[in-house]
């Protein structure tokens, strides 16, 4: 084997292979495969040996992040959202060189099919010669920005959102860095494509459009082998797992194994919006069957063809999964439960919140983003949270989670007992207003919201009886905020706050146009899915989107950069307050209670800083010492999709 340099010799006799390098190399042995080493002429040399996890770095390249404040402490965490930057991808600038040795690069043909390192037509002339790419690409060399421009042009040619979704997923499988650069720079246009509402349709048709597997699938057939399956995943330094069992996908119900589109979409946002490196993210679907007859009878369905398991069988598989994750990835891996049905969502969160770093976005993430919107809305309507009365349509994960966080915030502001602050919040479920006379028949998570009141069966009657100042929909039932409901809200509120949170768009309690029209332009409105601006009486109203994507990427980043070992409710309150602080007077003047997504990475950095600060304050952070400038530190830890130069 030819050496890179005659100085600073590093040798290995593993599998009969030896090499030399002029600079430090990180080494780890994997199974034998064909790799390419660089000879003295600068060209890769084909050889059969072991894969080398290493990068020839600039000797001056920083290993740890130093925040902007020159007076601040130097944190011990390496860059990239707290994940070791083995290849120098985040600490390197475009002028530094990296060597893509994590996979086989014995041929240029293979390199072009590796989404983690492929640059397409952006490979330079030198790289084409060095990595056997000459002739495998057209002669033109284009830059990253032109590639983004071309891809956006191509995507906009599709009129059907699902086709745009498929184009984005194809790009992710082909060129990871181009995918994330495209998404980051066009987030407002592409967010509804890679996530709600389009991802819902993608999950419904996942078996039909399925091409390449993404993430891990763990089924009942794998009981006793979960740890082995986790070890099959090629990336070993996982920091965030998003897991679903597919039972309650958005407002679409039980989609079984085809719910995988949700973890995949969520984790793409962890990277694009929160800066967590893609290699540190792992989407997982737990397949315990489905009760959806349409799926079971679909010849293209990709999951187990059996009725959904429950009880002991379900609990044992989930317990094995949680134990295996902790054993394989350690104490500080974040496990986000996603789209579990109510009965499992609450039980899993309660069971594992004291033993694992767990987060339920449907319960906690939704609550945090809604609370942020309410804090912002108070600047438009006046008063404090304690001055308002809240009525929810929907008493599931989202509804009760939001209600509890509102009650916690009021308790924090007023020093009143939580039992008292809950009395300002009323919930309606499928059987009507939740009152004390129904206590014996209520599910355990609804019981704290059973107040003294006569039974009310119809939602409109509940609105008229309670006379709330804030109306929140989390029912998953479309068109339930009727004209009569909105008019009733407008009759006893000068500026009624109406939040129609259910996803996707078809399940929204009302549209933006309906809310503004029926309230005669007086409502403060936000929704879970995006709506176009509305013109009413010569004025244009731009509604806000109460999207969990405001919260969970920054929240996760905050947990990682602090090395948090548990999630505490005060961290959720801190995230809400941080998001509300990002709404400016200009946004208020336009009727917005959430900031635009165009600046989402800076918003996420501020949220991460607040969450990390709270983790340090509560003694739940393990990454020491604490950086003095947490915002700058969070920004410096974020993954960049810029191309790296290859030797």
Curated annotation (Swiss-Prot):
Pathway: Photosynthesis; C3 acid pathway. GO terms for molecular function: malate dehydrogenase (decarboxylating) (NADP+) activity; metal ion binding; NAD binding; oxaloacetate decarboxylase activity. A divalent metal cation binds at residues 338-339, 362. This is NADP-dependent malic enzyme, chloroplastic. SMART domains: malic (SM01274), Malic_M (SM00919). Homotetramer. The keyword Magnesium does not apply. It is an enzyme of class 1 (oxidoreductase). Divalent metal cations. Prefers magnesium or manganese. It comes from Flaveria pringlei. The chloroplastic ME isoform decarboxylates malate shuttled from neighboring mesophyll cells. The CO(2) released is then refixed by ribulose-bisphosphate carboxylase. This pathway eliminates the photorespiratory loss of CO(2) that occurs in most plants. One of its GO terms (cellular component) is chloroplast.
